[in-house]
Amino acid sequence: MQIEVFTQSAIKITTTKNIYFDPYQIKNKYHDADYVFITHDHYDHYDEESLRNILKETTIIITPECLEDRVKNITKNYITVLPEKSYSVGELSFETISSYNNDKPFHPKEKLYVGYKLKIEDKYFYIMGDTDVTNEALKVKCDICFVPIGGTYTMNVKEAADYINTISPKLAIPIHYGSIVGDINLYKEFIELINPSIKVEAYIK
């Protein structure tokens, strides 16, 4: 298994399949995506240029309902999802987790944005999307958590660390910092706040 974080929240997990999440600023024409998961409709999470650079004829896109009108202009191979549901598509089974701000206006709960929990090679991954620490997120059990730390639009670094220490995954991977909001070195503060029993890997440096 190989994990890559390109920038912001753009993630690629490679096993026997290539699984992307929120592709953004991907300039190379890979055309290798088997699945693409989109968390919400902001430009740094739904980037059509990046999508076109990774899509192939059989790619399946998984997207919140708010993006259906845009996605269907790119491909017919997509499904729409709602928060707090379970789905299966192809070889993958996954759950959607509500992704929203508690007291900020950027990601209202009523927009029905999502994070994703899915099982890959006997490990449970949680890709949170742009969210604060919510009741729904606190219920998630996972092995690997991609957690936003940049603040402003999401939880800040201390909130993110407290959250990770609470749910205690085996591995935490900080995202959503270093390009739009959050200093590139923010991951260092995050690492210092994490329980030593939890491994941290920072791909954005």
Question: How would you name each of these model-derived features?
Answer:
Residues 108-112, 155-162, 186-189:
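Charged helix-capping and loop-helix junction motifs
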Residues 27-28, 42-46, 68-71, 85-88, ...:
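Active-site environment of divalent metal-dependent phosphoester hydrolases
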Residues 1-31, 80-140, 155, 203-205:
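Core dinuclear metal-dependent hydrolase active-site scaffold
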Residues 24-70, 141-146:
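Active-site metal-binding motif and surrounding structural segment of the metallo-beta-lactamase
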Residues 117-170, 174-182:
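Metallo-beta-lactamase
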Residues 21, 37-38, 95-99, 147, ...:
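Redox-cofactor binding/interface segments in oxidoreductases and associated redox assembly factors
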Residues 1-4, 75-87, 138-141, 161, ...:
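Binuclear metal-ion centers of metallo-dependent hydrolases, dominated by the metallo-beta-lactamase
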Residues 49-102, 114-116, 188:
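Portal/gating segments that form or line small-molecule/metal binding sites
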